């Protein structure tokens, strides 16, 4: 794989190639967050997702193979589970790739509570190579179609995700009151 220049969240807004998509999901922010850990379950072109070391958390690394686009090593730059307000975020930068289309790339998934579920905002930002610039119109169309396909898949999985709930049982070793 070819190393990519490191990107940070604040640079996502300034890259030459930027794609955004938003949609409503009838699921909880916690459920969506859980499913974002393994995009091979819901993203149609991702054929594998392998974590190196711990799963999740800022600095953790995973490798995904995306059919037609190549293999990407991703480093998490934001890993924010749903808090009291219900908002959550996952963002990562690609540090290595086999793709001839990009020289720098990052993605950001923002999950915000909305009536009856959540709003998912997906931003993909990249510095494209010469080949990537030629392919940009087709890339945008492909990304738009992929979002249309993966959004309902992600929604279905997130709606049935096992979300940890506070227990009403006393903790082991804790006397019941």
Region locations from a protein language model:
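Short coil-to-beta transition motif at edge beta-strands of beta-rich domains
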Residues: 56-62
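Hydrophobic pocket/interface hotspot
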Residues: 32-39, 62, 76, 92, ...
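Short, P/G- and charge-enriched loop/turn segments at secondary-structure junctions
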Residues: 7-11, 62-63, 95-98
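Hydrophobic ligand-binding cavity/cleft-lining segments
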Residues: 1-54, 175-177
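Hydrophobic-ligand binding "helix-grip"
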Residues: 44-45, 53, 67-119, 125, ...
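Hydrophobic small-molecule pocket/channel-lining residues, especially in calycin-type beta-barrels
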Residues: 24, 37, 57, 75-78, ...
């Amino acid at each position: 794989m070819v190393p990519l220049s490191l990107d940070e969240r604040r640079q996502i807004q300034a890259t030459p190639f930027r794609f955004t998509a938003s949609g409503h999901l009838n699921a909880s922010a916690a459920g969506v967050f859980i499913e974002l850990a393994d995009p091979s379950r819901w993203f149609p072109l991702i054929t594998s997702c392998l974590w190196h070391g711990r799963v999740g958390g800022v600095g953790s690394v995973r490798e995904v193979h995306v059919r037609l686009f190549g293999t990407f090593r991703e480093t998490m730059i934001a890993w924010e589970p749903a808090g009291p307000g219900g908002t959550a975020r996952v963002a990562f930068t690609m540090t290595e790739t086999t793709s001839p289309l990009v020289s720098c790339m990052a993605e950001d998934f923002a999950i915000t509570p909305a009536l009856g579920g959540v709003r998912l905002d997906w931003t993909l930002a990249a510095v494209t190579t010469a080949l990537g610039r030629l392919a940009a119109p087709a890339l945008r169309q492909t990304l738009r179609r992929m979002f249309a396909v993966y959004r309902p898949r992600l929604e279905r999985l997130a709606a049935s995700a096992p979300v940890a709930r506070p227990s009403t049982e006393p903790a082991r070793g804790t006397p019941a009151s």
